[in-house]
Amino acid sequence: MEELKNARKVVGLNQTVRAIEEGQAKMVYLAEDVEPKILQRLEQLCKERGVSVTKVADMKQLGKACGIDVKAAMACVLADSDNI
């Protein structure tokens, strides 16, 4: 997950969903402690759009990996990023 700090990305539910729907998502990282309904919705959307999903243990770890000081439920590396 070290690549998340330097990759061109978006963090959070709304921005991640938008990136997936607009075809800009290359890889989605989902925290496993997200509400199950949201987790299922995102996994289904990624499957439909052919976007790879990587699960992360918890939101705190994902936030840290993104280089932010708060928890993150999900993050999305954008397709034009060279770091993945």
Which residues make up each language-model segment?
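Ribosome large-subunit tunnel/peptidyl-transferase-proximal elements
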Residues: 1-25, 35
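Glycine- and other small-residue-rich loops at beta-strand/loop junctions that grip anionic moieties
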Residues: 5, 31-32, 51
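Alpha-helical elements of the RecA-like P-loop NTPase motor core of helicases
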Residues: 18, 40, 64
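Signal for well-folded cores of large energy- and translation-related assemblies
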Residues: 21-24, 43, 47, 67
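Amphipathic, hydrophobic secondary-structure cores in small proteins
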Residues: 36-38, 43-61
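C-terminal structural segments of small proteins and small subunits
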Residues: 52-84
